Regions:
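Sequence termini and other peripheral, non-core segments
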Residues: 1-76, 80-196
Length: 196
């Protein structure tokens, strides 16, 4: 669970997602938004997993949404708490989700199934979401790459922890990913005073 906040602009941020994240994060952002709808607008009930463990679930009164949205997941994860705390947060993730769907089509020449299933329904904000100003998403990453600036931190996270698999099909490698020789050289790419 994460929100790869690689740029303040959700469209540019989506373009900066590496190939693996373009595929994966479309689903994850849809999961975050689905969870926001269920937790904010749904009715809580107890269910059982396949292993007969108790689990909290939320049922939506709108049968169309109930039957299409993903189940609530990781409700206490900082990214989930953040997205459902503000309409501006939800809107940012939705805009990045749509941009990622476009990015997926650009890179792979086809439409992601999650786009077909959820793009239209997720454009609607949860009914009970608060209207507040935007704050940067939480930095869900190891402490050694965190900084006081969330965009810088997520770019550091990519440089240090995602460099071994990160590639960009039909896109130029982002400037912040160029000339990286290893994890030990992180200080070359950032001002050490930015560490939190």
């Amino acid at each position: 669970m994460n929100i790869f906040y690689l740029d303040n602009d959700p469209i540019k941020s989506a373009e900066l997602h590496c190939d693996k994240h373009v595929v994966k994060m479309i689903i994850e952002y849809a999961q975050l938004m689905s969870t926001a709808h269920r937790v904010l607008d749904g009715e809580l009930y107890e269910d059982r997993t396949a292993n007969n463990r108790r689990i909290k679930r939320w049922r939506l009164s709108d049968s169309n949404m109930e039957n299409v949205l993903y189940k609530a997941s990781h409700i206490n994860h900082p990214s989930n708490i953040w997205i459902r705390s503000s309409d501006s947060h939800y809107q940012f993730v939705y805009d990045m989700f749509v941009a990622l769907c476009n990015e997926y089509t650009h890179r792979y020449g086809r439409v992601h199934l999650t786009e077909e299933k959820l793009k239209d329904i997720l454009q609607h904000l949860p009914n009970n979401i608060a209207s507040t100003d935007f704050v940067d998403p939480p930095q869900a990453m190891p402490d050694d790459v965190k900084t006081s600036d969330a965009v810088d931190a997520y770019q550091n996270y990519y440089r240090v922890y995602k460099k071994d698999f990160a590639k960009w099909t039909d896109r130029e490698t982002p400037a912040f990913m160029k000339n990286i020789s290893g994890k030990d050289n992180l200080s070359k790419y950032m001002d050490e005073e930015l560490y939190v």
